């Protein structure tokens, strides 16, 4: 049994690029990112401090990716890193998609009451427009409505920039976990083979 701090230099099947294994880890990594996004979207409804939440989601994604890589016995470091980046992109986009689905579902449930209110008070009907029915226009609508960050509301380009920062923080946290695992599993990266 390997002791902590010892480095494995040769893992059966590890280190070589294999197309089948790459497709498995990349596809599975995207699924892991999507599943993590669903859990993050559920948690985000109750707790989502800015800057902290994307780091927590990224750490969870990193742990999930390590477990996925261990499950499929992936050994090619570059493939593992690319799969983690793909999973981080799925996490970031997935959180917005699952929020979109939740808002769409809530809007459909409230549609009869909203229609009655619109008929009774037509002058107020334009103050809170309904969200678009497709994902791309929904993101633009959401950016236009703004994202509250403390006492500041980021709208338009600033909302998009804050979402991009969330994605980068999640990716960095996931890569930190996966990178530490790779280093522990494959040894010091300075011994000739980098990521």
Regions found by a protein language model. Name each.
Residues 1-7:
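Short, charged cytosolic
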Residues 8-104, 108, 182-187:
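Hydrophobic alpha-helical segments, chiefly the membrane-spanning helices
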Residues 61, 73-195:
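Core subunits and conserved enzymes of cellular information-processing
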């Amino acid at each position: 049994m390997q002791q902590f701090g010892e480095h494995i230099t040769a893992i059966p099947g590890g280190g070589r690029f294999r197309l089948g294994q790459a497709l498995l880890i990349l596809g599975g990594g995207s699924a892991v990112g999507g599943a993590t996004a669903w859990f993050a979207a559920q948690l985000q409804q109750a707790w989502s401090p800015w800057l902290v939440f994307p780091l927590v989601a990224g750490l969870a994604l990193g742990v999930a990716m390590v477990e996925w890589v261990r499950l499929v016995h992936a050994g090619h470091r570059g493939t593992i890193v690319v799969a983690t980046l793909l999973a981080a992109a799925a996490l970031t986009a997935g959180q917005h998609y699952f929020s979109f689905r939740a808002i769409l579902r809530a809007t459909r449930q409230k549609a009869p009451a909203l229609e009655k209110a619109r008929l009774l008070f037509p002058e107020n009907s334009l103050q809170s427009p309904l969200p678009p029915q497709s994902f791309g226009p929904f993101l633009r609508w959401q950016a236009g409505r703004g994202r509250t960050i403390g006492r500041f509301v980021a709208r338009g380009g600033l909302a998009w920039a804050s979402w991009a920062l969330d994605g980068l923080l999640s990716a960095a946290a996931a890569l930190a976990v996966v990178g530490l695992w790779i280093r522990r599993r494959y040894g010091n990266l300075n011994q000739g083979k980098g990521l």
